[in-house]
């Protein structure tokens, strides 16, 4: 039985190495980036996961969950992309808050009808904090006021200016409340694996929007072409499944 389990782990490990090459070293996570334009790719033929929005159902970070998310990557489809060029972050955006989405990119927090960048309100995105520089929402700890956030959604790109980075109590839900008269974005993640009662929050306000076509400024195109920040998820999966 032990030998059989060891063989299974070798197989899984080899499989993860293969998909990691695809997800880590390519600059195309759901998008084709060219010199002049950025277009959504419909190549993902998965059926997707049912969107969930219950924060209480989200489990703490673990290498086992990272491994499961890596396996289920084929089942999810991004519906947008977020970049923060000042800290080298570029991630796909998924609809709904669940453990798979949180390990693969940024997850939309709310089911509200206007909870997307096309509408007024508080557009809330969450992701895991992984202790691997540059992975998922780890780069948020280095953002500064005045820096830019870009969100590609449908046929537009929305530009936000960062107002600040804040450390809050997990019980402080004021940052997650709706702001129907405003056009703001809220990004949040854990502070670390060892401080479950605290969260990092980045708040920004919308300053501009662009058509997603050949007129999109090159520096914005470049921001979405940053290497994937999913390394931590796959490295954690390797660690969990690596044959001993």
PLM features: residue spans?
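Solvent-exposed, non-transmembrane regions of membrane-associated and secreted proteins
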Residues: 2-244
């Amino acid at each position: 039985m032990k030998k059989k389990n060891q063989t299974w782990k070798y197989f899984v490990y080899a499989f993860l190495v293969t998909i990691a090459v695809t997800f880590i070293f390519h600059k195309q996570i759901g998008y084709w980036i060219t010199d002049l334009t950025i277009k959504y790719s419909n190549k993902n033929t998965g059926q997707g996961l049912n969107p969930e929005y219950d924060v209480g159902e989200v489990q703490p970070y673990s290498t086992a969950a990272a491994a499961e998310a890596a396996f289920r990557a084929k089942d999810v489809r991004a519906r947008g992309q977020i970049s923060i060029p000042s800290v080298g972050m570029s991630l796909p955006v998924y609809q709904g808050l669940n453990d798979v989405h949180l390990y693969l990119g940024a997850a939309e927090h709310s089911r509200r009808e206007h909870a997307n960048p096309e509408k007024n309100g508080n557009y809330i995105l969450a992701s895991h904090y992984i202790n691997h520089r540059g992975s998922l929402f780890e780069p948020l700890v280095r953002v500064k006021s005045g820096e830019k956030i870009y969100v590609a959604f449908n046929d537009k790109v929305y530009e936000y200016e960062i107002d600040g980075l804040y450390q809050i109590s997990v019980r402080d839900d004021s940052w997650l409340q709706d702001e129907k008269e405003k056009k703001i974005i809220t990004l949040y993640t854990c502070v670390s694996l060892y401080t479950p009662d605290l969260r990092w929050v980045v708040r920004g306000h919308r300053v501009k929007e662009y058509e997603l076509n050949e007129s999109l400024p090159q520096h914005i195109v470049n921001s979405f072409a940053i290497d994937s920040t999913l390394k931590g998820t796959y490295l954690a999966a390797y660690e969990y499944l690596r044959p001993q």
